[in-house]
Amino acid sequence: MLILTRKVGESVLIGDDISITVLSVRGNQVKLGVEAPKEVSVHREEIYQRIKQTKDEPYLGSS
């Protein structure tokens, strides 16, 4: 895992077209802005896990 230190207004670049910028820091909460192409999905981890779980569950609809 790469660990970086950034200040408000500073960014991290991933490849040529993804930018993550620190927008604010308040206590233990950090607000990030993500700029990425539309074809790149960006989710919070807990949302991604929920999406993944939903895809893995068998369909139980009536026939």
Curated annotation (Swiss-Prot):
The keyword Signal does not apply. One of its GO terms (cellular component) is cytosol. Keywords: Activator, Cytoplasm, Repressor, RNA-binding, Translation regulation. It comes from the Bacteria. The keyword Magnesium does not apply. One of its GO terms (molecular function) is mRNA 5'-UTR binding. SUPFAM superfamilies: CsrA-like. Gene3D superfamilies: Translational regulator CsrA. InterPro entries: CsrA, CsrA_sf. It is found in: Cytoplasm. GO terms for biological process: mRNA catabolic process; negative regulation of translational initiation; positive regulation of translational initiation; regulation of carbohydrate metabolic process. Homodimer; the beta-strands of each monomer intercalate to form a hydrophobic core, while the alpha-helices form wings that extend away from the core. A key translational regulator that binds mRNA to regulate translation initiation and/or mRNA stability. Mediates global changes in gene expression, shifting from rapid growth to stress survival by linking envelope stress, the stringent response and the catabolite repression systems. Usually binds in the 5'-UTR; binding at or near the Shine-Dalgarno sequence prevents ribosome-binding, repressing translation, binding elsewhere in the 5'-UTR can activate translation and/or stabilize the mRNA. Its function is antagonized by small RNA(s). Belongs to the CsrA/RsmA family. This is Translational regulator CsrA. It comes from Haemophilus influenzae (strain ATCC 51907 / DSM 11121 / KW20 / Rd).
